[in-house]
């Protein structure tokens, strides 16, 4: 009698667990389908359109692993940031030149409805893509060592192999006219063929409340796109879309100057870092 009761309870529990697992998988698939539906515009030709199409297949990528509801939310936010950022980059209309350096580094900008003014850095680097990926992703927390505009970056939480929650403390800028800011962001990293995309946007993380004496700013949909120069795999084209709400009261002229200058300085500091720091065996 006891044995029969045990078997009955065990069978019911097993069916319940199977049903729960199935429901979680259905939820994951629903998220993937919703992201696919929200993708900006129709699939477009070229490498950027290919990345957008493939990155929307979230459901099938997550089926094998179960995440908490909060983790799924962060993964979804990262995917949405990537879709929005790539959608902005893919629209070639309306870009205006902010500055251009003698070495060819260029910053463009435009106003995007619902987002605000965004900045686009175009850089060609004499380094293979895997080397950039190593420095920008694998060594992310070391960025404060070579980029004086960043005091510190910490990974607060890692979710799977593609998603992280980070806290970034930025230095004061424009002769201290812009005081120190910090950012809490969800970041998503994907590789599609020969292209790597590093995307992110602001998020809420309860374990990192606002800090005293620092203004909590927010990243809008932001991304870096890395892909080898056609015919020269030892060189990499880097495109950085920057969207930031610095918060506080600041004249637009100062904001525009600070953000475009930040991108130019980033390219310069990154080059020096790549030339002076040895590469490891990291691969994108």
From Swiss-Prot:
The keyword DNA damage is assigned to this record: no
Gene Ontology annotations of biological process type: bile acid biosynthetic process; biphenyl metabolic process; cellular response to alkaloid; cellular response to antibiotic; cellular response to cadmium ion; cellular response to cAMP; cellular response to dexamethasone stimulus; cellular response to epinephrine stimulus
Reaction catalysed by this enzyme: cholesterol(in) = cholesterol(out)
Domain START: 66-279
Keyword annotations of the record: Lipid transport, Lipid-binding, Mitochondrion, Phosphoprotein, Steroidogenesis, Transit peptide, Transport
Transit peptide: 1-62
Residue numbers bearing the Phosphoserine modification: 56, 194
Gene Ontology cellular-component terms listed: mitochondrial crista; mitochondrion; neuronal cell body
Top-rank taxon, per record: Eukaryota
Database matches in InterPro entries: StAR, StAR-like, START-like_dom_sf, START_lipid-bd_dom
Record-linked SMART domains: START
One Pfam family per UniProt: START
Record-level Gene Ontology MF annotations: cholesterol binding; cholesterol transfer activity
Pathway: Steroid metabolism; cholesterol metabolism
Subcellular location: Mitochondrion
Summary of subunit composition and partner proteins: May interact with TSPO.
PANTHER family, per database record: STEROIDOGENIC ACUTE REGULATORY PROTEIN, MITOCHONDRIAL (PTHR46489:SF1)
Role noted for this protein: Plays a key role in steroid hormone synthesis by enhancing the metabolism of cholesterol into pregnenolone. Mediates the transfer of cholesterol from the outer mitochondrial membrane to the inner mitochondrial membrane where it is cleaved to pregnenolone.
The protein's name: Steroidogenic acute regulatory protein, mitochondrial
């Amino acid at each position: 009698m006891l044995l029969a009761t045990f078997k009955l309870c065990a069978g019911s529990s097993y069916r319940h667990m199977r049903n729960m697992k199935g429901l979680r998988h259905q939820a994951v698939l629903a998220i993937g389908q919703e992201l696919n539906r929200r993708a900006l515009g129709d699939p477009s030709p070229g490498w950027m359109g290919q990345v957008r199409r493939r990155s929307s297949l979230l459901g099938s990528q997550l089926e094998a692993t179960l995440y908490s509801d909060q983790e799924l939310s962060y993964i979804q936010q990262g995917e949405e940031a990537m879709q929005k950022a790539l959608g902005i980059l893919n629209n070639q209309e309306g870009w205006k030149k902010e500055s251009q350096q003698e070495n060819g580094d260029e910053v463009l900008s435009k106003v995007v409805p619902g987002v605000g003014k965004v900045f686009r850095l175009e850089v060609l680097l004499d380094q293979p893509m895997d080397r950039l990926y190593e420095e920008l992703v694998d060594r992310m927390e070391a960025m404060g060592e070579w980029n004086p505009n960043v005091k510190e970056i910490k990974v607060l939480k890692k979710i799977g192999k593609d998603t992280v929650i980070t806290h970034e403390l930025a230095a004061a800028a424009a002769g201290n006219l812009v005081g120190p800011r910090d950012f809490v962001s969800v970041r998503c990293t994907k590789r599609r063929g020969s292209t790597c995309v590093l995307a992110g946007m602001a998020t809420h993380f309860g374990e990192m409340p606002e800090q005293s004496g620092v203004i909590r700013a927010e990243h809008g949909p932001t991304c870096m796109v890395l892909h080898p120069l056609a015919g020269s795999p030892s060189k990499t084209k880097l495109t950085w879309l920057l969207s930031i709400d610095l918060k506080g009261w600041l004249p637009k002229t100062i904001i525009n100057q600070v953000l475009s200058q930040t991108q130019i300085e980033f390219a310069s500091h990154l080059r020096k870092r790549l030339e002076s720091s040895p590469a490891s065996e990291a691969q994108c």
